[in-house]
Amino acid sequence: MRAMIMSFASYNLWQPWQKTSPLLAELFTDFEPGIHISQVQMQSGVTGINLPRIYSVFKQSLDQDPTAEWTKKIIPQLENVETDLIHNAELRDLYFEQIVDPKLSAKKARDTIWAMRKNKDFKKIAREVYLKHGSRRRQQFNRASN
């Protein structure tokens, strides 16, 4: 859920992770800055190391909340809306006007991100990021016996 929210904010709404990260962090009961920031950056696609993850909010809602029980609990205005309508976002007349078309905005983000990744310097820059910040196995040092 966290990954999808960050992905949607970054790709579909094209918001900078630095602004959305603190808003999301406020909702966590298990907030750990060292984990949160790196995950936010990864889900926002700014590291260049990981493949972009642009989630389908429709697929995620169907997979994670097939009966829409959680969605209806979080958004009480949807309590009497049919589950099928909730999962395909046909809510314009029932709840609110969409601020972005999820399918079109995901396609635009995907096209934009992949165009950037095709840049001739992308791999070089991504490698530099990895060498500076990427996770690596720690070397095992043999302890001298006393």
Regions found by a protein language model. Name each.
Residues 1-146:
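C-terminal catalytic domain of photolyase/cryptochrome flavoproteins
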